[in-house]
UniProtKB/Swiss-Prot annotation:
UniProt cross-references to InterPro entries, sorted A to Z: ARM-like (IPR011989), ARM-type_fold (IPR016024), BP28_C_dom (IPR012954), HEAT_type_2 (IPR021133), HEAT_Utp10/HEAT1 (IPR056473), U3snoRNP10_N (IPR022125), UTP10 (IPR040191)
Membrane topology, from the record: Multi-pass membrane protein
Family matches, as PROSITE patterns: HEAT_REPEAT
Species: Aspergillus terreus (strain NIH 2624 / FGSC A1156)
Gene: utp10
Highest taxon, organism lineage: Eukaryota
This protein's name: U3 small nucleolar RNA-associated protein 10
Amino acid sequence: MASSLAAQLSQIAANSTNQLNLKAQRIAHSHSLIFDKKVAGSQDFDTIYDICFEGFQELCQLDPRFAQFERTIFSPQSKTEERTEMNVAQNKELDTVLEAFLALVGGRLLLSPAVKAADWLIRRFRVHEYNTTATILTFLPYYSTPLFLNLLSILPEDLTPTFKVLLPYKKSLINPPRHPLVHSATTNKPFLAALNAYVIQASRQQSAHHALLSFWAGIFTEAVSGMLDASRSGRRGVEKVKHDDIVLSVLPILNDGLGMKDISELVIGCYMVCVVLAQKAALQDNVLDSLMEAIVASWTVETVSSGLICLSVLAQQKPEPTIPKRVFKAILRLENPIQQLSEISSQYKTSHLLLAIIAGCVDDLSKQEDTVRLDLLSLMFESQILGESETGQGMGIVLRAASSAHKDGVMSLNAQTHLADLVQHFTRSESLQPIFQKTIAESALDVSALEHNLQTVIESAQAPKALEDVEMDEAAPKQQEDEFPSLLQSLESEPLMKSSFLSAQSIPVFDRLAQAFALAIGSQEKLESFANLTVLGKSNATKSPQYLSFFVRVFSGSYPIGTRVTALNMLSSFLSDSPTDIDFQALVPFVLVALGDVSERIRREAAAVLAALGALYKKAKKDNPSVWASDSLYGQAKQSKGVNWLSGRDMSKIFERALLPGLEEYVLDPSHIGRVVEATLRGTLADSDASELKKPLRLALFSFLCSHVVQLPLFAPKLGLLDLLNRVEKAGGTTRTKELEPLLKMWRDLGVEKAKDICDKERISAAEMEAQVVKIVTPKEKDAIVLLLSIINPYSNSLSPSFVAAVFGRMKDIWAKIPEDRQEFAAERLFEVSLQESDSPLVDGCREVLRSVQVPGPVLVRFVKQIPVSVTDIESLGPAPKRRRTSQNNMVAMTVKDEAKLSKLMEKMTFILELVDGSKPEDHPELADGLFQTLAALHHFKSQIQSGMSYLLSLALGSLLAIVNKSRATAKPLFNTSVIRADLVVDCVRTTESPQVQNAALLLVAGLSVIAPELVLHSVMPIFTFMGSSVLRKDDEYSVSVIDQTIDQVVPALIQSLRNQKRDVVSGTSELLLSFTAAFEHIPSHRRLRLFHALITKLGTQDFLFAVLAMLANRYSMDKDVLILMTGLASDATAAVELCTYCKYLELVTDSLRPKPGISQVLLGIGSDDGREPQKVAVDLLRALAYLFRHSSIKSKMAKALAVEGGEESEQIRSYFSQILTQILTIGDTMQEMKAVSQASGEVLSALFGTLSLIDFLDTIEILLQRPGDELRRKVLRLLEGRLRQNPERDSPSQNRMLDFLPTLVTIVESSPDILLKHAAVACIDRITEKYGKKDPSKVIPASKAIAGQSCIGQEDDRIRIMGVLCLASMAEVLGQAMIPALPDALNRSLSLLEVSMEAGKENARLHDAVYSLFSALFVHLPYMISASHLDQILLLSFRSAGSEELEDESRQEALRLMARKADLAATFGVVNRNWTQAVAAGPEATKETLETLSLAIEKHPKSATMKNLPVLTEILFKAFDLRREQVALGSKAKFDADDLEEAEEIVNDVTIKMIYKLNDSTFRPIFTKLFDWATTGISKKDRHGDVSRLTTFYKFLEVFFGTLQSIVTGYASYIIENVVAVLGKASPSNQNTRTLWLSTLRMLRNAFEHDQDEFWQSPSHLNQISEPLISQLAHATTSSLANTVIAEAVPAITELAVAADSTDNHKELNTVLMRFLRPSAGPSGKAAGGENPHTRFAALKAEQSLTEQLGEEWLALLPEMLPYISELMEDEDENVEREVRRWVKQIEDVLGEKLDDMLT
């Protein structure tokens, strides 16, 4: 069938890609990000490619990764590629490249090149259509920018549900806010999935960027949070399932994200999501652990801080403070975990994480091979990173682990020592001790087992409680019994140790013995077994050193306290049973060290050993018993022999007199032994009972102890003994340095690695050891500094840097204690080393020492004097003088060798000057001479080598400045001022570009000007010139201070010098002033006022302010910033000084205008070659002065001063003011020919008057008005008007004075022949009336009469007329009824003026508007005084005005609106009724304005007034309704075209509706029937055009009537049904005469049907009357255009009738009539049924479709009747009818839900 083929063809056309349709292709490619659619559509691909490729090339320069796309999507071939011509595989490959480019370009989309490049993808490859997801997600991070808006505008309409959130914003073309995006991510899973997939893919391609990742992280985090919040449920089970689903959906994203650890922002985003999951979802411990492990696996240096925060949050969610081992190891590997944890702990809860780390540190103690974990543990408690309760918990973890460590195996000695030290730290720390005691008290720990395991004593613990726990007490040893026997057995086979255990630091068997000894503690049996080992040789202990030396080494080492105590105990036990013929003095040094231990238990046991030794000496029978181990204590070598042993007698004396008396104090105070040793060796024992030791004995004791320090191989006891001896500088004639110098050299020779190894083995601090070693050198040593220097000089790389630093530190410590002569010698030596050519720590250290210590003055002088000599020496390296003079740039030619010498010299000079600078040069004034010589040498040298040498100059100047500043504070300079070289200092200011040098030189000049002004002032001006061009523009605080000081100190000296020379100070300082004014624009804005104020204050405000103001005004004219500065400067002065300044200022202006200028030539450059024209200078100065009068504080200052009557200041002010006024008037009079100067003087005069109060101003004006010149009088009145335009004074005296001034103005109006003067007077009257008229209206009435009279608005001049009328308008507003006397003249003359203003060819818009302004004021304030005749004139003139194109409408319309609002309603209706004909004759505009006036009058007046004047209103409306008929009757003479009539009738209908609202039914119904009769029978039937016109107007009204009032007036339809039927019978849309009537009738019916709520149209009588005539209107559809009209107008009316009919019978009747027009065949009558024309059938089908759509199944109840017709129509000859019936069938099927095929067969 033809119709089927057509459908197929249309479908193919719809899906076609238009490959041959170039226009369609152009439209498809006209979407653009950067061009409008119209512009884009006109571009070809060559143009587009050129633009976009340019952007692409710029991108390639920014990022080389873009270059790969040049071969593909940006190749020239891409211009011809069309996606629609590619196959699926090619398109897929292209998509991959396009999406890769989009991901890469996303980070630069805010750059223009990127947008251009992206536009190529839009224009050529249409990525917004084919790759919509990737395109949107690329641009989405910029959702708030105009760029995203451009993208929205070109996106396809059919966006997928993924991006449905963008649809509303695409339609309205506004940027989406963030909240909807978050909401979509939370609720729309495809959207979030797409975003996540895009971000992960971009990250894998290394294309992710900050904008994308920050956007994604925020959206993803909030979405996850929102999803978890939304899944909250009252039922735990349901909530858990939902949360698990969310977690499972999020974990894969986190897994992918955390796997890309190099992309830090992606990883941090994942951390954020982890935090949200942990806080809002109840995660299981295994999930938390997995997340933790993923986090530590992902962190890098950049993300570790965020990772730790995330870890802390996750750990906080766990019920127990535990973390996986992998996480703990990762934290352990961090560079400084404690610092990083402390940084985050201040902001986040980290307690669980920290406690978990503590638990990790003490986990598997027996398996820990190193001390890394325990070191971290100690640091955690020392750094106090935990809170109080968490610290207690942490201590509990440590203590529990330590007390149960024996269950898992034996702790290493290192671990045991570490933990023992930590527990001792708990007990000793002031902050930790209370917490520790509380933890011990609250825990159920076995303290005994703890002490046993750690071999320490917990002094705060209560021992009895622990001992009660018998089971634990027995359990601990039982576990260890298995360890001790095996170890003991292995040691039993060891032979006797060949030498002392003190003979070497590393003895393998000793470590095993120490371990066995530690295990034996606690069991006497074990200790005895241990003591009897062969290797110890106990049986021969008195003759060989092995046995005792073992215990000495144990208690002297860094072992647990319990172990050391037991060793001491073993020693004291042995000594108590020893024979008395053995001298055990070898033990004394070690016991002395033990007596200074921090542990009281050790000190107690050491005191016991000391007492045992003392007892042996008491019991000794021989004076000199043999010394135990004298030749083998430190081995068989010379070390043992190098010890200076004491005799037994001497040692006995030492014990008796020095050591034993303080036995109890040693136990109580660890520092007591040090004091005793010091006092003993010094010979100043505090105990009066003990006799002092003789000098030889003290020397012997000192040598004895020192020799042990030197020979002892072990460094732990060596350090303790050295600490005791370093308290004593000398004893018995020898010095500490002499005795211990070998140790100093030995330590130096150890080297870095060996020293570190020694300290690590013995667990002592290398730094502490080095500090004690260098203390060996005492300040009383003759060449202490030189000795220290010799230790490290010459420098060797094997030297420990820390040791070198310690040596230099010692130099600094003792420097102040050595004599000055030795200081000088030492300083010279250090200086020599400092200048060595080396970068070694030796040179740096010497320099640092010299910088840190106070170098003697003579040495500094010698150093400084080396500089000029060195400079002279190096100049010999340059070329001959002649060559230097003739050289182009004076550059000294130097070889490489010379350059090295130059570099060395520069380094030397720098060091010397830095040394001087750091040595408080103010304390060494003798340096001044050398420094000035240095300054000269530097200047000379600078000119030779063409170098600024800024740093050296600033150092030299800074030192001189310090000396000079101190000299300023004394009566007499501290140095010889003859050495001052001011020229050099000035050169420093002028020739350097360094701000530091400039500032220092300026300060030095300032200082020198105080102490030696005669040497400085002759060179001051160049300084200020330079300051103006350079220094003043600086904005740092220091430069500000420099400038302030320079002004404060130099300027007063300069002024005083000029006065001493009897020179004019202003002229003399003109150069200075010029420098500052020229520098104004360079001075930072916030400093200008302060700087100039300081300058003027120092110069003298009264003498110099005028000059500064004038120079600024001359140079910068009316620059706003300059004016603000000038205002600030002037405002700071008193009123008298400010006025005096203005007098001098005006004198300067006058001087500049003279033929032979005086001071203005100096200050302003008048008359000079490069000076400006005097007139321009004068204008600038006068305008600036006017600004000053307006904006400075002179007005308030004058008012305040003048308030004090009879004061001297008030007299000065009056005198200066009078002088200024005279000067201004004189300038104005003499310069009238120079218009610019005259105007500027007028501005000044205006501003000057502005400084007066209103009363004083009027007094002055009255005097000036008496002067003869009209020009001055006009100017004065204009000034008064200007003053009144602002906010004049409102106080009562000012108001009365102003009203009293009115007669003066009235006199001018009535008598002056000068129109301009009159105009000015009227303007003043207007302002006075407006501002003050209400105060006393009676005083204004004469003025109103004068204005309304012949002398004002009666004049011929338009300016005075306009001003007068406007003044009358103001008076009407102010005076109200008081104006009635002037009203007759005012109205008559203003009406005449209105008529004059509209004369053809002479229209005067301003006069026209002014008169209407007066009418408006009268309507508002005096509406009752305007008579009917005046209203008629106003309205008639308004009609003329409305017809004029030259005049504006606003003022007239406003007057008419006010008449409608304010005038009596009867008067308004009356004037409209009387003048309606004239309004129509005047044209559409006049008619429209008249109707609008009528409408507003009805609206704004009450209902009662409308009812009262209803007859007149009805008469007006009937006239208005007849407008169409009248205009049609006029034919070609009509003034209204169709549009004008439509517009007028709309207003008439609106007026009628407003009237109806004010009436009731009984009042309106007669009017309606009258109107109906008027429309239907009120005109002869012969007048067909008149009849149609009236009916058209009537039905247009009814359309509005039924549409507006709706169901209220449905019953009124009964009046019009018959006439409607008649009209439908004769009116036709095809007849132009009746078309409008036909349209308005159908529209009226539609409104009437639509709003029927009273079943009016259900009535058969009504329905039958209207249904057939209405449906018959379908017959008018005989052409395509008529069919469209019928479908648009008749079909909706038919549909609304069917809805209103609302019954099956009525519907059947309607359908019967309607179906006639569906069939072309003849009916029974033989006549055509009505559907002969296909357009008619088409219209009828449209009616059926509308009815089906509106009524649905109600209408389809008639389907059986319709089916035959439908069958016929489906075979209709007309293709349009056939297509339309098929649409109707489809519509029916959609409604019924079943096919019609079976019914139609």
